[in-house]
Amino acid sequence: MHGGLTKALRSSRLARRSVHSHALAAEANRATNALVSLKFPDSPPAEKGPLSGLRIAVKDNIVTRDFPTTCSSNVLKNFVSPFDATVVHRIRENGGQIIGKANCDEFGMGSLNTYTIHGPVINPFPLSKVGLNNDKRSAGGSSGGSAAAVAADICDAALGTDTGGSIRLPASYCGIVGLKPSYGLVSRWGVVSYADSLDCVGVLARDVETTSCVFERISEYDPNDPTSALPETREKADALSSQRLDELSSALAEGSLHGLRIGIPQEFFPSELSNHVLNRFRQSVQLLKERGAQIIPVSLPSTSYSLSAYYVLASAEASSNMARYDGIQYGERIPTQDPSDLKKVSTVYARTRSSTFGPEVQRRILLGTYALTADAFDNYFLQAQRVRQLIKDDFDRVFAMPNVRYAQPSNTPAQASQKVDVLLHPSAIRSAPRLDEVETAASSLDAYVQDVLTVPASLAGLPALSIPCPPSSSETEEVEWPIGVSIVGQWGSDHFVLAVGKFLESAASV
């Protein structure tokens, strides 16, 4: 399957190299602030693997032995890991070139890539479409640097992390493809933790083929990662996906989606959703209907509470993970002028953490610490866990494929016919916001609501692929900023989701 794909990708990369030199890539990086470190190899690598010649950027919260890993935080500004993360090792052993580290929100906490010691990432879309202008917009976050590097053609693909939408939101804003895999399919060993039960390593690229090729090489069982899905669980999920793809293969070969059941979750159209996004999404749905897909409205009632549950759970886990950065065990220590302060451990902690953590990280530590206190534990943390389980149950209820992680009876043919193969929804409530709007926002809640459409799949641990919406059918002289549409599948159906994404991508380009 991947032999022809690998050759095609390699030839397209070589062609692009001739028109996009390292100097142009460096210039694009200066314009976007996408990568915080950038180094191209002195000579082309030998063809030694399926990712040979592929230039890949790595988000700055994934450790690399030859680049600093700062997590965009002062507390780790001088840290260089002695080893590579598992995903980085697999990229290298398959021939990929790691060219640098991508800017991100501090420790992955943010939706607009503005909480960073390296400065905000600028969306490269206007650079490629209308030339450099003053309409500077966010690239999204927290994997904004990864998305911008791909969109600006600085690299062919990038690794990012997605906790509540940090790959899909930037992919939508920058007009590229972004995959958040099923939780546990890609190793987290060597990823600096934000929220362990939610963090996923994923892929951003310009097209679904490249995304799929990179994902294929990094999605293997890793005994070093206690959350890595076991081989037998992966095999069961792959078998179900392959079976469903085989059932649809005849139609797909003829350019049709006949037999594919796509659910439209009714709760994913909040009041904050812009009319422009809604209209573009409707055009995507119409395109799928014209290709023979069956569009089915579905309800996921508990997802209405997902944003609140997510920020309680993620912040609680963050408060625990951030406790290690105290200036004694880990992280930069802020010097003290008074020697007596060194006798007070709490003083060293407080001085280091208040000086090196940014405002958003401090805010989430406070929120998470409060949620874990005795007075708030039942009403906040445990209640959020209950909501999370209800959200998982909602998704399992509408999917035709069973969730192989749980012991449950398979759907009968009659039951399966009333359910859906994938879900489709807008990736974001709007197109990329202007950076000056972000900087003058009255409340951090304005940024939190950007994740309202992406956190349900994160809480359920499901695969979600954001791809660009087809161009608008209306004629206008104004530049249309990118808008993404997300395809969500049952746990472990990542290859099926990618196949549907590939078809929609191809149909949109006709």
Swiss-Prot record:
The active site is at K59, S142, S166. It is found in: Mitochondrion. It holds the Pfam family Amidase. The keyword Nucleotide-binding applies. It is an enzyme of class 6 (ligase). Its main location: mitochondrion. GO terms for biological process: glutaminyl-tRNAGln biosynthesis via transamidation; mitochondrial translation. Keywords: ATP-binding, Ligase, Mitochondrion, Nucleotide-binding, Protein biosynthesis. The keyword Protein biosynthesis applies. It comes from the Eukaryota. Its EC number is 6.3.5.7. One of its GO terms (cellular component) is glutamyl-tRNA(Gln) amidotransferase complex. It catalyses: L-glutamyl-tRNA(Gln) + L-glutamine + ATP + H2O = L-glutaminyl-tRNA(Gln) + L-glutamate + ADP + phosphate + H(+). Subunit of the heterotrimeric GatCAB amidotransferase (AdT) complex, composed of A, B and C subunits. Allows the formation of correctly charged Gln-tRNA(Gln) through the transamidation of misacylated Glu-tRNA(Gln) in the mitochondria. The reaction takes place in the presence of glutamine and ATP through an activated gamma-phospho-Glu-tRNA(Gln). Belongs to the amidase family. GatA subfamily. PANTHER family: GLUTAMYL-TRNA(GLN) AMIDOTRANSFERASE SUBUNIT A, MITOCHONDRIAL (PTHR11895:SF7), TRANSAMIDASE (PTHR11895). This is Glutamyl-tRNA(Gln) amidotransferase subunit A, mitochondrial. The lineage of its organism: Eukaryota, Fungi, Dikarya, Basidiomycota, Agaricomycotina.
